């Protein structure tokens, strides 16, 4: 896979454009500030009221409505939650799109699953740093960067890829490296990773381990330490050097248990379920379910959230974390 760096991107492609950042949240604040510091003209679309509006003002922007930002801009980056993008696009952005504009996204959900259907005379691109916004901003100010991925869904101008690469340079990503993907690949792999591994898989693994120990008569506090608290120690090692570094860093006892017992937890049945989850994503079943849930008031979603917060592991963890002076309160 080709990796694109500073010399591959031409920031001048953005010099005569106004970039609208729609949503001043986790990613929005980093994109807006980094682009501005790279010499790009930026307007922030953020509804009045709330912390993000005030934060944008603190950072030297004069936030306006999404509609006004879209009207002023030549490149519109939508960095809102997936479930609200389609409505904001329909009501505020689409009426203000001009032929030749660039519509940009940090995640491909609404384009891939056809919740947003841009006109044929605009470019549709993606530029997505592979890290949280605070890290995107901090590394930029330190002279480094978080790597990013870019994609093109619609190339009306014939320059969409180059514009996406220029945008990635504007937020600093070409300092570390930029990879090309597609909206389909980014969306489907992102959803799968969240559901099967990073969020869904890990959450259920932690809870199942905790419950197994507690049901066997062990103290909940000890079960919490062994099944949840120590995850960070292992994840940090994996993050820094992959599974190999983690295994090099743990005891032989732990490594032997990893290699011999791990496959009994994540077994052929688990892998079959992963394949089913991926198929549901690929066929749009998950997207339809998620969209319907949001359109009907999120009653089931809210109930699941409430049940999760009432789990014993949350109560135990809340008490134990009071003992941890290094955690931010």
From Swiss-Prot:
Alphabetical list of Pfam families matching this protein: KARI_C, KARI_N
One GO process term, biological-process aspect: isoleucine biosynthetic process
Residues involved in Mg(2+) 2 binding: 190, 226, 230
UniProt keywords, alphabetically: Amino-acid biosynthesis, Branched-chain amino acid biosynthesis, Magnesium, Metal-binding, NADP, Oxidoreductase
Domain KARI N-terminal Rossmann: 1-181
NCBIfam families: ilvC, PRK05479.1, PRK13403.1
Name of the protein: Ketol-acid reductoisomerase (NADP(+))
Gene name linked to the record: ilvC
